[in-house]
């Protein structure tokens, strides 16, 4: 058997996921160069401290800054704003690779790119993009996106945070947000608030607006409870409190009262990343279980040569590959400017379900060893469980998909 250090996930020895699928367009040389450099960074800088950070909960700001220098923290932000301007398929592969090594860091990268920067790219004016995106793309500032509240999770339009317009066109923001990634370490915040009552004949999604501001430019903003989580423990998650925050008129992000359409687009983009994260953590567990069962002998032979174990590995491999194909399809549709709400709902739902399942199977294959912290598979499971909740729960994805199914067959 290998040592504890050697038993960790090893991205450098992982099967190459780039371009091996006959039904998926292969990655080009530039894309492979990006992933190769990232894998080297993950192996040398991220993997050695991942288990310790899981125990301490320490946020790895130094690693985030280095990823900023590599272009990873502004992966899909246009070059003119300081980003790398990568396609979505490459971004999804980046997220998968980081998840294989450190789920907490993966969530930081995914949310920073897809949510805060994603919303500014979708709804921002040119002036807002010029002001906020360069610092975000370089990770000089981290981005946080505030939608969820104590009383509004999946029912996101039920938010109570409000912003009142003042005679001079400025705004006063009051309320709170829960479970905000980068909540206490963020520098730039995009916050959803109700500015108007829903218009007659419109749903409660109407009348919601978005605002963007830098933390160091406002007063009345404080950090509440920092969450003690099951997994993803070195990813920062905190409550935000707004008490009469004065925001200038130019803080309004997008059209007044009509931000919810942008929110849906942001979440669609975010689901690519969360799906890839679920896939990556499942891949980490699968690869670890495959190595372990080839080394661990029971009944006179390696566990992997028992048909029950071999067939379970085959099933895990097939499901993870299917998840990757669904994610790639959604990514390609997004980049082509085609509707991808339904494909990404399928991808996010399936990839996170089978990713968590792979983690659970890995624990089972390791037996008692899978349940102790000396081995990483329990961490993979704890980290991955969030992917079935964040950016829209399993139930929300099934609702989105089922509505499309019924519409197709009713017509």
Where are these regions (language model features)?
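Alpha-helical interface subdomain recognition
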Residues: 1-101, 108-111, 123-127, 138-139, ...
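A short core secondary-structure module
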Residues: 170, 174-222
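Short Gly/Pro-enriched turn/cap motifs at secondary-structure boundaries
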Residues: 109, 151-154, 179-182, 201-202, ...
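A short, Trp-centered hydrophobic/proline-enriched beta-strand micro-motif
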Residues: 139-147, 192
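Short Ser/Thr-interspersed hydrophobic loop/turn segments at strand-loop and sheet-helix junctions
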Residues: 71, 95-99, 193, 213-218, ...
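A structural signal for short hydrophobic beta-strand segments in well-ordered beta-sheet cores
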Residues: 161-164
């Amino acid at each position: 058997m290998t040592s504890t250090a050697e038993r960790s996930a090893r991205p450098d020895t992982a099967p190459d996921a780039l371009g091996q699928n006959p039904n998926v367009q292969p990655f080009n040389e530039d894309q492979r160069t990006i992933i190769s450099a990232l894998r080297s960074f993950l192996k040398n800088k991220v993997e050695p401290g991942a288990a310790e950070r899981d125990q301490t909960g320490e946020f790895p700001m130094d690693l985030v800054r280095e990823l900023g220098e590599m272009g990873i923290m502004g992966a899909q932000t246009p070059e003119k704003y300081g980003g790398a301007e990568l396609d979505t398929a490459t971004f999804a592969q980046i997220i998968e690779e980081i998840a294989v090594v450190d789920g907490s860091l993966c969530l930081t990268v995914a949310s920073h790119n897809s949510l805060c920067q994603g919303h500014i790219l979708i709804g921002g004016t040119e002036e807002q993009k010029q002001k906020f995106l360069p610092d975000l793309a370089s990770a000089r500032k981290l981005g946080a996106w505030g939608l969820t509240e104590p009383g509004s999770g999946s029912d996101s339009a039920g938010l109570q945070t409000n912003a009142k317009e003042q005679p001079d066109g400025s705004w006063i923001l009051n309320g709170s947000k829960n479970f905000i990634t980068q909540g206490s370490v963020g520098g730039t915040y995009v916050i959803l608030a109700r500015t108007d009552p829903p218009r007659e004949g419109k749903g409660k999604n109407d009348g919601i607006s978005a605002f963007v501001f830098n933390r160091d430019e406002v007063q009345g903003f404080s950090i509440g409870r920092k969450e003690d989580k099951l997994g993803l423990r070195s990813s920062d998650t905190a409550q935000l409190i707004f008490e009469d925050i004065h925001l200038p008129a130019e803080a309004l992000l997008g059209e007044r009262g009509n931000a919810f359409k942008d929110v849906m687009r942001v979440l669609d983009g975010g689901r690519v990343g969360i799906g890839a994260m679920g896939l990556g953590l499942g891949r980490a567990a699968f690869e670890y279980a495959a190595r372990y069962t080839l080394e661990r002998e029971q009944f006179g032979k390696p566990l992997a040569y028992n048909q029950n174990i071999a067939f379970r590995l085959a099933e895990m491999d097939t499901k993870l590959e299917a998840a990757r194909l669904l994610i790639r399809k959604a990514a390609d549709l997004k980049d082509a400017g085609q509707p991808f709400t339904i494909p990404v709902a399928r991808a996010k739902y399936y990839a996170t379900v089978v990713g968590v399942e792979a983690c659970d199977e890995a624990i089972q294959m390791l037996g008692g060893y899978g349940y102790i912290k000396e081995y990483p598979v329990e961490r993979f499971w704890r980290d991955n469980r969030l992917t079935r909740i964040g950016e829209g729960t399993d139930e929300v994805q099934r609702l989105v998909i089922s509505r499309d199914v019924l519409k197709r067959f009713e017509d």
